[in-house]
Structures are given as C-alpha cells and as structure tokens.
C-alpha cells in the first residue's frame, strides 16, 4: 500500500459485533477508509490519541466498501500485556451459553429496561456457574458490581477478568409466582481453548410419531412429545410441544435469535409462552389467539443438540 497515508471518517458505532469476530471482540465502526496494507494501523481521534487498531472491513469484493472496523485500543493493550508478561492470554470463564434481553422479554417479565444476559444453558456440570447454582432461564443483571447490558457485554466483562478471581453476580430468577433477585459469589474459571459457541451445535431432529394438530398458531404445526423422545432426552412428556412443521409464510419463520440464526426449527420443543406452560396444542392456541398486534411474545424453547441433550433458547418477538 501507499506509505504515510491518512484517511478520515466518523465513528458510527462502538461495541459492534461482526460475523468474523471472536466472542470477546467488539469493534469500533468507522467509515474511514481501511484498505489492503493499512490493516493493523492505528485509528486515532482528533487529539491524536490511538483509540483502536484497524482490523476488518465489510465487503463482498475484498475492497473497501465504506465500512471498517477497529479493535478498541483497551482490548489490544490487555492482550499485549498478558502476552508480554506471561506469553499467553488467559480469560475468565463462567461455563454458560447466553442470550440478550430484548424489549419483548423485558415487557413480559416486568423489567424496567432491556438489559441483562439470559442463561440458556449451563455448559459444564463442574464449572463456575453450576457450582454457584445458576440455571437455564436465569437473567444476569450485574457482574462484579457493574450492570450487564447484554450477553456480549457480559462476555466482555468475564473475559477481561482474570481466572480464579471471586466476583459477585446478581441475577433474576422466575420462581413461577414472582421474579426474584438473587446474589451469589462465584470464583471464575479459566476459559478452555478452542471452545466453540452454541451456534456450532447442530440440532438433532428426533422422530415425531403422533398425528399433528390441524390448528397452526403462529404458523406452527405442533404435536405431543413421544415416549421415545422423552426417554432419550430425559424430559417429561408434558414438558412442552414439539414443532413438526413451520409455515414459510408465517411471522415466526422470520424471527431470529440474537446470534442471527433462525429462532425456531423443526424438532424444537416449546415449553412456555409468556411465562405460561404449554402441555397441549389447544392450550398453546388459546394463548396465541388472545394476543393482539403489538403484544410482546417470549417463548422458552428446547433444542435437541445431541441424542440425549437439549439446550434452552429464548425466542423474543412482537406480534405483527
């Protein structure tokens, strides 16, 4: 590239998640040109202070397309110091999968604003979260005395906190009759290398035998949990309803999780909708029919991720 070149632009977003970024990296978005040869160079503010390291561009051709991303200098400095002093990067670890609270979840659960990280799966039976008693469905709202804005924010806070450190975590739990706020002190573990995110898990579709119901609330064809499925996944047959088919023209077919993947898939098990358990298709249909345009919807959904395991998903959307 051309040496001694300076480009200028505006910052339009901070803490931006990108498809190619790691779970620990949130980028500064700018329209200052980043081309081949100056990636890795500094992003500076008007005072000449380095605020980021140019890292990525959004492009379909390989050339600059008007949007670039820089790693915040604070993150780069933390990694540098660890490499300089210890020769490796160590990150704190909770041992959970997370999703972010959206407006629909906050409305259904009576939260003042859409802040917090929902625990969708406790990953390790002997990990820090499991030892502290956290469960799927808990919402972490504070970490080490600091409010948690989202799943990504919590990941950043945990990863930048050293392993073996004890921290106080505040979380909300639905007891069935009330939302209770709890505090727990936990000792962080060290994140193992090469751990993939939940999006790497591919759902295992199990056979659905009973005849499906004719009604299609939200465009979903639902059926009861089979005895074989209940035994295989170690769940009760009344634990929810199995999604047998999704109408491609339905609203829910376009609903995405925070990670960008489809919210509902065939073989998923819907457990609750707006805090109400659903043991049969008629009950589900009655709840859906009572909803009106603009109402918030939150569903607790289990996804089979192997022959014997499931993982919780929090599906959040608004009735259109």
Regions found by a protein language model. Name each.
Residues 1-10, 15-40, 46-87, 91, ...:
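Active-site loop architecture of trypsin-fold serine endopeptidases
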């Amino acid at each position: 590239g051309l040496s001694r070149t300076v480009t200028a632009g505006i910052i339009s977003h901070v803490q931006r998640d990108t498809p190619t970024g790691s779970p620990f990296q949130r980028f500064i978005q700018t329209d200052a040109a980043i081309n081949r040869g100056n990636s890795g160079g500094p992003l500076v503010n008007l005072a000449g202070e380095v605020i980021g390291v140019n890292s990525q561009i959004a492009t379909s051709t390989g050339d600059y397309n008007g949007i670039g991303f820089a790693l915040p200098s604070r993150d780069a400095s933390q990694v540098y110091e660890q490499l300089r002093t210890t020769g490796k990067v160590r990150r704190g670890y909770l041992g959970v999968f997370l999703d972010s609270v959206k407006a629909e979840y906050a409305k259904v659960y009576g939260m003042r604003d859409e802040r917090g990280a929902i625990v969708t799966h406790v990953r390790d039976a002997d990990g820090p979260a499991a030892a502290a008693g956290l469960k799927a469905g808990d919402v972490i709202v504070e970490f080490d005395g600091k409010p948690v804005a989202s799943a990504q924010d919590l990941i950043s806070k945990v990863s930048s906190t050293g392993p073996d450190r004890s921290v106080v975590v505040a979380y909300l739990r639905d007891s069935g009759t009330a939302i209770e706020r709890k505090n727990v002190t936990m000792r962080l573990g060290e994140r193992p290398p090469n751990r993939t995110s939940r999006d790497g898990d591919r759902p295992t579709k199990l056979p659905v035998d009973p005849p499906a119901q004719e009604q299609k609330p939200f465009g979903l064809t639902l059926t009861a949990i089979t005895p074989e499925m209940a035994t295989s996944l170690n769940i009760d047959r009344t634990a929810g309803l199995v999604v047998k088919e999704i109408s491609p023209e339905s609203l829910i077919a376009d609903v995405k999780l925070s990670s960008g993947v489809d919210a509902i898939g065939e073989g998923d098990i819907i457990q609750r909708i707006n805090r109400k358990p659903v043991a049969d298709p008629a009950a589900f249909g009655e709840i859906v029919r009572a909803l009106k345009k603009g109402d918030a919807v939150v569903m607790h959904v289990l996804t089979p991720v192997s022959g014997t395991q499931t993982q919780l998903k929090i599906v959040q959307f608004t009735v259109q």
